[in-house]
Structures are given as structure tokens and as C-alpha cells.
From Swiss-Prot:
Keywords: Amino-acid biosynthesis, Arginine biosynthesis, ATP-binding, Ligase, Magnesium, Manganese, Metal-binding, Nucleotide-binding, Pyrimidine biosynthesis, Repeat. ATP 2 binds at R707, D746, L748, E752, G777, V778, H779, S780, Q820, E832. The lineage of its organism: Bacteria, Bacillati, Bacillota, Bacilli, Lactobacillales. It comes from Lactobacillus delbrueckii subsp. bulgaricus (strain ATCC BAA-365 / Lb-18). Mg(2+) 4 binds at E832, N834. This is Carbamoyl phosphate synthase large chain. The gene is carB.
Amino acid sequence: MPKRTDIHKIMVIGSGPIIIGQAAEFDYSGTQACLALRDEGYEVVLVNSNPATIMTDTTIADKVYIEPLTVDSVSRIIRQEYPDAILPTLGGQVGLNMALALAKTGILDELHIELLGTKLASIEQAEDREKFKELCQKLGEPVPPSKTVKIVEDALAFGDEIGYPIIVRPAFTMGGTGGGICHNHDELAEIAKNGLELSPVTECLIEKSIAGYKEIEFEVMRDSSDNAMIVCCMENFDPVGIHTGDSIVFSPSQTLSDKEYQMLRDCSLKLIRALKIEGGCNVQLALDPNSLDYDVIEVNPRVSRSSALASKATGYPIAKMAAKIAIGMTLDEIKNPVTGTTYAEFEPALDYVVCKIPRFPFDKFPKADRVLGTQMKATGEVMAIGRTAEEAMQKAVQSLEIDEKDLYSAKAHKASDDEIEQKLVRPQDDRLFYLAEAFRRGYSLEDVHELTKINFYFLDVVKHMVEMEKEIEANPDDLDVLRLAKKYGFSDQTIAKLWHEYPDQVRDLRKANGIVPVYKMVDTCAAEFESTTPYFYSTYDGENESRKSGKKSVIVIGSGPIRIGQGVEFDYATVHSVKALQKMGYEAIVINSNPETVSTDFSVSDKLYFEPLTLEDVLNVCDLEQPEGVIVQFGGQTSINLAAGLERHGVKILGTTVKDLDRAEDREEFDQIIKSLHLHQPQGLTATTHEGVMKAADQLGYPVLVRPSYVLGGKAMEIVYSKDELEEYLHDHADIAEDHPILVDDYLDGRECDVDAISDGKTVLLPGIMEHIEHAGVHSGDSMAVYPPQTFSDEVEEKITDVTKKLALALNCKGIMNIQFIVRDGDVYVIEVNPRASRTVPFLSKITGIEMAQVATRVIMGESLEQQGYADGLAPEPEMISVKAPVFSFSKLADVDSYLGPEMKSTGEVMGSDHTFAKALYKAFAGAKMQLPENGNVLLTIEDRDKEKILPIAKRFARIGYRIFATKGTANFLKKNDLHVELVTKVHEDEQADDNILNELRDGKIDLVINTMGHDIEKNSDGFIIRQMAIQQNVPLLTALDTADALLKSLENRSFATDALK
């Protein structure tokens, strides 16, 4: 059926900020969908609150609204734009839930707006646990015994009836939010209560656990003519019981017999047809490893995380196809863009193995609960492609950018047998390394299977790699063993370690004997049809399919997996760099390892290499492509860390030189530059021993800021107020080495700001200065920021501009850089310089209209700022005021302290823009789900040193009609200052009392918690427990008084003044 001509304007709802469970994959799918709809001639209106995405670029849709994803906000835009239809199935769970909420308000019926793609009834049938169960039973498809409940008591009664373990699955949530496995009555009571609170319809499915079954996923497509097809079948390495987002995944399935595959394929097709889904959907199934029994777990009636993985694994662009199906086209009339000759109804065939491994945030949160279950904890993922499962898995491990570069972990090696068995029975994020260690210690396949329930085939893959380690170690410099090792994915670094050599020696031996990788094409059809996709992976098997073209080429290194501190913002910069290179006539080549992102869409660059971002893999691509040079400024710390090694091997680093990159990052050299330019910076000392750190702190006087050098995202950075705290910090970060000294700085309390600057060596352009709303001490990635600045005088802005220009020229910056300042008493202090793109590039690019990554790329390639039409100094400020607010995923990470400090904790961001600061703040808070009633109850739990500062804030809350709750000390102080305060008892006082803090939170009496008890970082301390309870109960929580002040500004703007005349 040809595309529809009765609709002209389509609204696409985005997925909002990045949180655990909903990451960059929706930027990828949303971008694809918008472009596909525009290609077909429709006007596209996009609504999304996340400025860090390619999707919210003005080139992606005809109209782009970066506004809060609330019913009020989206309804206002609908009334402004009058779209004919809305496409909600590409914005993840947020987009789906928004469509349902809009339908309930009646606005869609009132304005005759149609929902494209999957119909509302189908969405409800798939997402509503009870309706879905009824459908499966009607179709004769098996589901585990279960019951839908709306109250905790019903959950407990059902648990007693069918026995434990039991799985709780809240309705209309994603990433396993609020769910979990319960082994007893108490766990079920707690998890069911939490799940009911987090489900937008207050409903949970309580089902008998089938943990231990194989977990299989099918990505399925269907059109309005009932053509349906399987895009991809994926098999989880981990059995049922671990969320698929936290599981290692292989495609195609590795252990299914043809009979099992066909049986599960038929079930998936039957389900998508019965649900009448139009577009893409994800079916999750559980298969008994010992029989042909299976159960249906769930269906996601939308494009999902797995769809992005399936798209990259097969080359089949699911979101693009789903968008075309939504406008009425059918699979037999849509061309497959990979081959250009076959149609979209042909099922992809793979002649390689894909392995996905999740990337977890526990390097940032060492105290978090790392045990994996049905609630997702990973922030991102990597994907690798090889000819064998071993090769794909090894390459994926190398892509993770963690301490382990292969299957050997020093921590696992030191563990006792008991500890290893514990880790296998209760799997954590690092289980793969403990599996390998178990085989090193002689555990049999049967032993390990008994402990883990992981399929024998996957265990054998791990065991084979451990056996290969021994063979490599026993045969140094043996060419046959080297060939075999490379075939199974062993890196030069690992081989060098086993041979007690340097990686360069292994590389030289390889190259001298012609042992070099070939590059194979990902073509969706296992080479059955002619294909010209510029999408490649390396392997040591067969002939090379990637040829160097005649054009001049430049390699842009991506930023790898999404993690806290290095998010989708860096992918945004990578994509824009590619666009600029293409406009300048260069062949733009991307190397990256992240399946969720736009940069790894093969239609974005001229050539895509899906490879680990290691020195070996990047050099191999450089050897083949012989580029003009490599750009490292846009891939965050990942690409910067590769610069020196690439240069050592003769690869030209474009833009700022390696020597100058080092001068910015090396503390002593940087201090010399600051001194020579007569600039201010907080007094600081460097120490390489624990004693040295203690001495430095005494010399400077507390509080001090301590951090390791060469870090991103403030990892292991803390403000320390006393000797005891410093000793605890050193105990927690005991791995300080000579080559990574600790920096100890005098902690300055002032206004912090961020500047991104572009320099060509003569002219320095400052697109804007972003003022932080929180005082210094909160990491810039976790701080709210406003542009243009609201409290800086012209004189201060001039000083910041002047210092930025001096530093850019002194550091010989060529391209982009980021500087962080503290402004105190009119003086400007330099905190740090990052000689690369920062996470603020997308935000600032969107609101200034200056495409910073593109301008910087042109500078890197030799085009001056003057030639591009930019003048020296600070760019003119726009009329609109824009606020960036961080978004956190604490509800997914048990035991992570939510108190904000110098170590970054946010996973995403939103933006609010308006003509006044208060309105921009209101939108930013609304986008970050911090919407408060006009009057309510606020709980104040304040450290003694903040008591004076809280007084004006408390008075303003009282003035707009809020009741104030506080514990004894704070309450007495506020009462003395004429405020009416409701007294609550402390955490460990009368725990049964109704007015105990925790009971007040549990009973839903509190609308906002302000908690500045930053020293209460122990898990049993009052401050920590209150913060955790607020997060569990979904109560907005602020830990910085500046944020409370900003929130008040937005609330005061909404409320009317009620002043007595007398």
C-alpha cells in the first residue's frame, strides 16, 4: 500500500533525558524516524526535552521543540501546531506513556489527531500485564503462573499460594523499574510496594519465577497488510532472572536447535499479528534448557534498546522501516537501504557473530549494590563483531574501557574459592571475569553450570579462552599460536602480557609476518546479494573487503560506551565533526564501539569501523586507510587518551598537538602557564603518597578538594572537611600510583562557570559563558547551568573572556577547549582546562545557533574563524534564557548516595528556555520531573553549618503556602525566627511513631526533601537513610541550597502575592 496522502504534518515524541534503562538508542531511532518521514515528504514536528541529542538538531525535523515532556507542555504544542498525527512508538517508554496520557485527556479526539503505527488498544494490550496474559492464554501461548495486583496484600496472598521465588513486573515501566526477584514474604512486600508506586497505573504482575531458563529475544516487524518478518534473533548469555539490558547478548542465537528456533519464531510472529502491531516490536521468550517447554515473558510494542542493537548487528534500520510502515507503506514496497536492490521483507542473514556487553557505572559508585536482577543497572553497552563467539566476546571486553582488558581480573585472581562461588551464584557486573577465574582454578563445566545455570555452550566459550591463554603463555613468539590467538580475538596487549613483552613487540612480529586483520562488510544478507555498505568489522579470517578510496580521508574517533561522565553529548560532537568534514570534501571515517548511537549509523559517515577504541584497533584502521590525520577532540577522554600512542606510531593528530594536550592535563606544566600569564587559581599541591596528601591538606587548611589527575566526570573527587574524612578517602582510593598523583586544592566557595572556546591560534571565539546555579563543589555535570549568566557583571564577563583568550593562545589550542572558572568577590579563578569538546557543546550549540563542533572541525582542518565569519571574543547573547538541569538514575542504583559533590552522578540532562529566568527554571525542573504542587509540605534536614542559609529559604517556602517539617535542632532554630514548623522525630528515635521522618515519607505526606547532611555518607547514617527513602518513595530531593533557591524562584513565579495592606 503506498504511503498515506491524507496526513501532512506528523508530531514525533522523543524519549527525554538519558536514564538507566533508556539511553542513547532512542536518539538513534528518533533521528532515523524523523529523517525517514521527511524523506517521504511529511512535515515533522519534534518534541523532546533533551538538548544533548542529534534528534533535537534543527536539521532533523521541520520544527524542533525542546520543551518538558509533560501532558500540559505537549498539549500546548499540539494546540499550537495542529498535527494530523502523532508517532509515539520511537520515544521509548516515555513516548508511549505520553501518548496514552494525551489520549486520556481527550485532546486527540477533540482535534481529530491520529496515533500512527501501533494503535492505542494494541499498546495497552501489550503493556497491561493482565490483558497481555489473557491474550497469550487465548492464543494458546504459555505464560508463567501469575496474578495482576493493585495492592500489596494481594501480592503477598498470591506469593503464599504459589511459593517463592517470585518476580514482580510493574506495568507501563521500562528497564525493569520497580521490579525484582523476591525470595521471601518480606522481600515481596517491599518490592511490590515500590513497584506499585512506580507504575503509572499502580499495577504489578506477580509471577512465578522461571529464573534459569534460556532468555531469547526476537526483533519483529509487521505492516498494515499483515506481512511480518524476523529481523534478528538474540540469545542472552545469562539465563532468565537478569534484565536483558544487563545481560551479555549474542546474535544470531548460538544454542538453539532448528526446531527450537522455528517454534519460538512462530510464537513471535503469532504474537505480533494478534497484537496488530504496525512497525517494530521486541518479543522476549524463556526456553526450558531441558525440554521444548517455553514461556512468553513480554512484548515491547515499540522500538527498544534491543532494536538499536539488532539494527547495528544486522545493518537493517528498524526505526527507519517502522516509520515508513507507520505512514502506510508495506514491507514489500520499501527498499532495503543496505543492498539497494532487495526489499525490506527479506529477513537478514548473518555470516558473523555479534556480542553485546553492558557498561555499568560501578567504577563511579564502588559502594553500590552490584548484584544483577530484573531491574536494569547498566548505563550503556558495547558491541563487537567477529567470526566466532570467542572473537566477538574478547573484542567486546576490550571495548568496555574498564580496568580489565581481557578475561583476567586481578581482583578475581585474589579472591578465595568461596568468594568466587558466591560471585557465580549471585552474579554481579563482573561475573565474566570470575567465570574465567573459576576455570583457571580447575572448576569443571558441570561445576560452573550448577552454580550459574549458564548454558554449557557459553561456558565452553569462556573455558576455551582460558585454555588458549595457557597455550599462548607456553609458546612465546610462536607464529602459529599467534595466528590462532588473533583469530580468537586476543589483543596484542594480552599476548604481550602472557609473553612478558611489550605490545609493540607483538605488533611488529605480527606485521613482519603478514598477520594483519582483514575488514569484512556488514551487509544484512551474508553476501548473497551485491551490497555496498560502508560498514566494516575486523577479523583474522578470509579476504579484505574494505579498500582505501582515492579521496583524502580523516578519521574521527568516537567516545565508546555511555557511562556517567561521558554520555551522548560526545556522540553529538562526533556526528557534527563528520558533517563538517563531508562538507569540506573529505571522506569522513568513524571508529566506534557503541551500538546505541547515531555515530554508528552507517549512513552518517562515509565509512564506519565497528571496533574497540584501543590503540591496536585504531592503528590497524590507520594502516589500511592512511588518513590525512585523526581527530581526537570529540570523543571525550577516550579519544584524548589514544592521542599520544597514535602519534608515537606516526599517525598525525589533527588540531591541538599531543604536546599541548599534555601541557593542559599535566598539573605542574599547567601551573607554570598560569603563573607566566599572571592568572589566579585555587592554591594546590600534588602528592604521590598518602603521607604527602595528609601533609598537603594540613598546609592548605581544610576544607580541601582532592582528586586523581587525568580523570573525567570527577571520578574519585571529593571535598574533604577534616583529617578523619581524608583518611577515609585515602582508604577507599588506595590504588594511587606514582604516575597518577593526587591533586590537593584549596576549596574555594564561589560561583562556578563553564566556558567552551574555539581557537585557531589567532582568534578565540567564546560562544557563551554558562553560569552554574549551584555553588562551587558540585560537579559541573551535576550542576544546573544558565545561559546567559544571571549574576555576573560585564566586568566579570570581560575578565573571563580575557583569561580564556590568554589560555587558548598560550596552550596553542587549535580547535575546541573547555575551561571551568570560579568567580569570587569579582575575581576569576581558573579551576581546570580540558583541551577537547565538553558535555556542554550540544546545549550551547542549540541555544546560540553556533554549530560548535562543526566550526571547531573546520578550524582543525585549517579554515580560520575569520574565514568562517566569526569575530574574536564573546559571541552576542540571545534574547532567550536557557537552563540546563541534570537528571539522575538513583532509583535504579541501590546504596548509591544521592548527595551531590565533586564526583559526577547524573546520567542525562534536560533544558528549559523562556524569556525570563524563573520561567526557564520552571521548564527545566518540569523536564527533570521535579514538578511540585503550588502548596505542599517540605522536609528540611540541614547540617549545622547551613542553618543560617536555610532561614531565608524556609521563609520563602512558608510565604507561598508550604508547611515546613523539620527535626528538633532545625525546628527550634526556625521557630526562634518566627516560623511555624511541624516537628518530626529523627530516623533512629521512636521508629514506630507516625511522625518519624521515614514514616512521614512512606505515608506520602512530604512533597519535597531538602537534605544537606553531606557528611552522613555511611549507609546507617540519618542523612543517607533519609535520601534513600526519598528516592524509594519518588519524593523530589535536593542536596544543595542553591538548587532549592532556584526551585523557589520557579514556584514563586507561579504563585500570586497575598499581602495585607496593614
